[in-house]
Regions:
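Transmembrane beta-strands of outer-membrane beta-barrel pores
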Residues: 2, 39-43, 104, 111, ...
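Transmembrane beta-strands of outer-membrane beta-barrel proteins
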Residues: 33-35, 120-126, 202-206, 241-243
Length: 253
């Protein structure tokens, strides 16, 4: 907690909210729908101008006696050789907030087509996933100083030279940006046929699939399309024949 500024905190914190539901609905005796929804909201608070990794690197690289946390003048300690004071970097440079949102949704519709032909059914699926992450940064600089003592021939301090760096800012600057974003959509349609005979069984299917991914940035949209036909025949639970044929295409926009 930043004790010098009561209006905000630089304490690391995470807030997460998850929501999920799964529905199985029988619309009619021959029509079923399945719906799956999942949502997530996440907020993360962290010190303003230094990441977790850089902070740990600074702690490992800084000698234990390089300078005090604060000088005798009450100013943050520092030096020209080691300018980053880990305590000051984590408590006096403001704070950042990240907002991440995730949505996962899919729907499956199954239709029995026994009225047209025994063993015939159709299936339709659609899915949509979305993710975005935005960052808000409220940052400022801080004043720090180095104290170098001049010693006489006996090793007794005679004078201290104080050199100040940086500047003390009272107001927080603001910056906001979209750090990451992607969307994924999927559509499938299938026509299935299944028939059991006295000594054999048959299954055949034809399926169309379209998959689209949109990432952050220009020319980062990918589209995939597939048409797949497959079949299975079993005789006496002993002899089997399978086949599959597919056509696929990919484009980048």
């Amino acid at each position: 907690k930043n004790t010098d500024q009561g209006s905000y905190s630089t304490q690391l914190a995470n807030s997460i909210l998850n929501v999920r539901t799964n529905l199985d609905i029988d619309i009619t005796s021959s029509t079923q729908v399945k719906v799956n929804l999942s949502g997530k909201l996440k907020e993360k608070y962290s010190p303003g101008s230094i990441s977790d990794g850089v902070l740990m690197e600074t702690l490992y690289a800084l000698p234990a006696n390089a300078y005090p946390v604060r000088s005798h003048n009450g100013i943050w300690g520092g030096s020209n050789m080691y300018p980053k004071n880990p305590v000051a970097e984590s408590s006096s440079t403001g704070y950042t907030t990240s907002h991440a949102r995730t949505l996962l949704a899919d729907l499956t519709l199954t239709q029995d087509l026994e009225a047209l032909a025994p063993g015939l059914s159709a299936e339709f699926r659609i899915g949509f996933d979305a993710y975005s992450e935005t960052w808000d940064a409220r940052s400022k600089q801080y004043l720090y100083e180095s104290n170098i003592a001049h010693l006489d021939n006996s090793g007794i301090p005679t004078d201290t030279v104080n050199t100040q760096y940086g500047k003390e800012e009272k107001q927080l600057g603001f910056n906001s940006w979209l750090n990451n974003q992607n969307r994924h959509s999927n559509i499938q349609f299938a026509l299935n046929y299944q028939k059991d005979f006295s000594q054999s069984n048959l299954f055949a299917s034809i399926r169309y699939k379209q998959d689209k991914n949109v990432y952050l940035g220009q020319y980062n949209t990918y589209m995939h399309q597939d048409i797949i036909a497959s079949g299975h025949y079993g005789l006496l639970n002993k002899y089997y024949l399978d086949f599959s044929i597919a056509a696929s295409g990919t484009s980048r926009l």
